[in-house]
């Protein structure tokens, strides 16, 4: 055995510890000291001590091959200072784990028909500038439980009264998965044409988006209100110190011209959208400060300094995380954000699920199939559906669903059964329901396209209330908006340049196959690796 090891690796004797580099899918890299004759399983345990990925969820790839647990590192030709790529794999959760987690919670599960939804809330996005809403406010929950969410003003008050709720929502497996995958967030952010144009005009913002630590710190600040307040205090103190330094005022002026002013201009440069903030990624972040509406009362701004007088501004800077006083919102306003992130409410990572679809658009079953094949998506859905308390809070937000459950106790018991929810959300059941929904969409579109002058057309249109209600309830299947995301007109080679480089470093050299896998997984490197490895085994 020793001779064989010497013949395969002359410079390393059997049992001698060597350093092996491990590169994660989020770009981080670290070294692990191990023996080459050790098994892959023991090597994964060493990696788990240096990362947040458990050993049973690790997928190690070396030269395009996935390492099996019962094999040794030397059997794959691994040598000292070589690099092994690690991605997070999908592991089915045990049925006892969710029950144990539910039993450790101090709050008792509320009834489905209860009107008290303060523990969950439905406020505006924690990341309003990106359209990312893990709390399910606005249209984000339309793809999960239809429309009919509580008023956003009331939800904001609930958030203010219960700051721990934000922390609980950010601790969900869905949000944690996003925090551990900055590349996914960066790709979703860059899918927005306005955001991409802003980055092109301001390369400094591009450097921020290309730094995984900054994205991770931003998510951590949103998860921890105390940390966010501390960061805001430190920023104010730093700006005050910079202003007191020589040339500090000019430095702040340049920072305003290069950073803050482009962000303010981003709220007004929507020429085609007018004052509609739904297409603006920074409108909610800046509180519509750059949007002016005709007939607005300017008496509320009597203390604002005149820019032409040259007098310094003695008023405090506006709080981007606070509500804007006296702000008027258009009746048809929707949440600003990326189309691809519209379904992140509730299930926190459903990608295209819940995205606003054009009127009468027919959902695409192939997109649903691609989403259900995503291992991360399956894991997140299982974690959510296995928690009866979380499902009760979600269902209590929809008045129609709540009233229907009150009238049917048997249905309420079924919706509280985790096994039934898992079977109901299986890929086969979802595809069958999608087929039925497509037929309903076709019938609704044909009915709406009838000439009102024809005999019986008006009567048929007036009697479609039941069909509209049924289609609205189909939103509870998570298929309320499978119209496709706002894909930019950019070649996939440019869109997935970073992901293609990572796949090539892992040993996948077929560029065309890599592009097809990335297109099918919407740029998810982990899912693309799973897809490529599955195609190799076929």
UniProtKB/Swiss-Prot annotation:
One Pfam family cited in the UniProt record for this chain: UBQLN1
Alphabetical list of SMART domains matching this protein: STI1, UBA, UBQ
Expression sites by tissue: Ubiquitous with a strong expression level in inflorescence.
Localization in the cell: Nucleus; Cytoplasm
All copies of domain UBA, residue ranges: 491-535
Subunit and partners: Interacts with 'Lys-48'-linked polyubiquitin chains via its UBA domain. Interacts with RPN10 and RPN13. Interacts with PEX2 and PEX12.
Gene Ontology MF terms: polyubiquitin modification-dependent protein binding
Full protein name: Ubiquitin domain-containing protein DSK2a
Residue ranges of every copy of the STI1 domain listed in the record: 138-179, 192-231, 357-394, 398-433
Chief location category: nucleus
A cellular component term, taken from the record's GO annotations: mitochondrion
Gene3D superfamilies (UniProt xref): 1.10.260.100, DNA helicase RuvA subunit, C-terminal domain, Phosphatidylinositol 3-kinase Catalytic Subunit, Chain A, domain 1
Region (Disordered): 95-120, 289-316
Biological classification of the source: Eukaryota, Viridiplantae, Streptophyta, Embryophyta, Tracheophyta
Function: Binds and presumably selects ubiquitin-conjugates for destruction. Prefers multiubiquitin chains rather than single ubiquitins, with a binding affinity for 'Lys-48'-linked ubiquitin chains. Acts as a ubiquitin receptor that associates with the 26S proteasomal docking subunit RPN10 for the indirect recognition of ubiquitinated substrates of ubiquitin/26S proteasome-mediated proteolysis (UPP).
PANTHER family documented for this protein: FI07626P-RELATED, UBIQUILIN
Family annotation (InterPro entries): STI1_HS-bd, UBA, UBA-like_sf, Ubiquilin, Ubiquitin-like_dom, Ubiquitin-like_domsf
């Amino acid at each position: 055995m020793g001779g064989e090891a010497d013949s395969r690796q002359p410079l390393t004797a059997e049992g001698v510890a060597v350093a092996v580099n491990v590169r994660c899918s989020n770009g981080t890299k670290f070294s692990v000291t191990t023996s080459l004759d050790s098994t892959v399983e023991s090597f994964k345990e060493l990696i788990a001590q240096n990362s947040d990925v458990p050993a049973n969820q690790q997928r190690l790839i070396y030269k395009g091959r996935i390492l099996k647990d019962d094999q040794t590192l030397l059997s794959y030709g691994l040598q000292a200072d070589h690099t092994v790529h690690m991605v997070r794999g999908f592991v089915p959760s045990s049925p006892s784990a969710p029950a144990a987690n539910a039993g450790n919670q101090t709050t008792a599960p509320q009834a489905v028909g209860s009107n008290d939804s303060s523990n969950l809330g439905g406020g505006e996005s924690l990341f309003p500038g990106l359209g990312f809403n893990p709390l399910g406010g606005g249209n984000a929950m339309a793809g999960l439980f239809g429309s009919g969410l509580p008023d956003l003003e009331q939800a904001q008050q609930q958030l203010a009264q219960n700051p721990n709720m934000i922390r609980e929502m950010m601790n969900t497996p869905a949000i944690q998965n996003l925090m551990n995958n900055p590349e996914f967030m960066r790709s979703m952010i860059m899918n927005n044409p306005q955001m991409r144009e802003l980055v092109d005009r301001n390369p400094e913002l591009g450097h921020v988006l290309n730094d995984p630590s900054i994205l991770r710190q931003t998510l951590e600040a949103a998860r921890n209100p105390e940390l966010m307040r501390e960061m805001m205090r430190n920023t104010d103190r730093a700006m005050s110190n910079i202003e007191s330094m020589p040339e500090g005022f000019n430095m702040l002026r340049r920072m305003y011209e290069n950073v803050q002013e482009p962000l303010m201009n981003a709220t007004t440069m929507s020429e085609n959208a007018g004052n509609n903030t739904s297409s603006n990624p920074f409108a909610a972040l800046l509180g519509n400060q750059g949007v002016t509406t005709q007939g607005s009362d300017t008496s509320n701004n009597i203390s604002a300094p005149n820019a032409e007088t040259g007098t310094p501004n003695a008023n405090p800077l506006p709080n981007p995380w606070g509500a804007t006083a006296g702000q008027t919102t258009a009746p048809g306003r929707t949440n600003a954000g990326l189309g691809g992130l519209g379904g992140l409410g509730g299930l926190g990572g459903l990608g295209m699920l819940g995205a606003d679809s054009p009127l009468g658009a027919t959902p695409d079953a192939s997109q649903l199939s691609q989403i259900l094949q995503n291992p991360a998506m399956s894991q997140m859905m299982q974690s959510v559906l296995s928690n009866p308390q979380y499902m009760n809070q979600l269902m209590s937000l929809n008045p129609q669903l709540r009233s229907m459950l009150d009238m049917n106790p048997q249905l309420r018991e079924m919706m509280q059964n985790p096994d039934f929810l898992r079977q109901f959300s299986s890929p086969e059941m979802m595809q069958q329901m999608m087929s039925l929904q497509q037929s309903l969409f076709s019938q609704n579109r044909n009915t709406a396209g009838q000439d009102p002058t024809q005999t019986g057309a008006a009567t048929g249109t007036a009697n479609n209330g039941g069909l509209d209600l049924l289609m609205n309830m189909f939103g509870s299947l998570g298929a309320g908006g499978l119209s496709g995301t706002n894909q930019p007109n950019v070649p996939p080679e440019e869109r997935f340049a970073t992901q293609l480089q990572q796949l090539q470093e892992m040993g996948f050299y077929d560029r065309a196959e890599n592009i097809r896998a990335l297109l099918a997984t919407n740029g998810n490197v982990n899912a693309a690796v799973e897809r490529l490895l599955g195609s190799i085994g076929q």
